[in-house]
């Protein structure tokens, strides 16, 4: 596997949590990532509760994108609605020390390919808060397009953020 390649694998709590829990170091960044679904800083029990909740309610599975040594460089959760054939990506994050190298795009391309080829999704959706411009640009670079917006969906301190709904259709990557 070339140096800059990634592989998707299931998130393994005992191996991966300590690594990814260090990626978000600021409260505002944390709010952009999870919209208040977990405490800051990320605590193991709270993170497990969040993963269990989205697994039970939405069928989400957590994944990591790992480098050639098996070390996580990215994380996301994915579910598919088999009735509508729509996949959903959530809680996407990339190791901040690895940003700017195209790994976020590579991880998203792998995630979307997985969704289309292995879960039968016809489209994959995600939401991103409007202030998270870096993430939104990354999603757009993969082929995601904004199709809706919930104005004033989230408040952080004195700020009000919109929630942007984005989608990519099969064949759009």
Predicted feature descriptions by range:
Residues 70-74, 134, 160:
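Glycine-rich acetyl-CoA-binding "A-motif" of GNAT/NAT acetyltransferases
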Residues 105, 130-148:
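Conserved active-site alpha-helix within GNAT-family acetyltransferase domains
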Residues 102:
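Glycine-rich phosphate-binding loop
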Residues 117-127:
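Conserved GNAT acetyl-CoA-binding A-motif
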Residues 159-173:
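Terminal substrate-recognition subdomain of acyl/acetyltransferases
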């Amino acid at each position: 596997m070339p140096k800059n390649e990634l592989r998707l694998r299931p998130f393994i709590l005992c191996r991966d949590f300590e690594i990814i829990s260090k990626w978000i170091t600021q409260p505002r960044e944390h709010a952009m990532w999870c919209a208040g679904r977990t405490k800051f800083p990320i605590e193991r029990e709270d993170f497990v509760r969040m993963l269990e909740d989205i697994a039970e309610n939405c069928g989400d599975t957590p994944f990591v994108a790992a480098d050639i040594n098996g070390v996580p460089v990215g994380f996301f959760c994915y579910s598919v609605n088999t009735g509508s054939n729509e996949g959903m990506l959530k809680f996407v994050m990339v190791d901040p020390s690895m940003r700017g190298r195209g790994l976020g795009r590579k991880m998203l391309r792998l995630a979307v390919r997985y969704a289309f080829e292995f879960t039968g999704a016809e489209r994959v959706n995600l939401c991103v808060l409007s202030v998270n411009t870096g993430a939104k640009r990354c999603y757009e670079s993969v082929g995601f397009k904004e199709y809706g917006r919930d104005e004033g969906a989230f408040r952080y301190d004195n700020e009000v953020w919109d929630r942007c709904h984005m989608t990519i259709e099969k064949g759009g990557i």
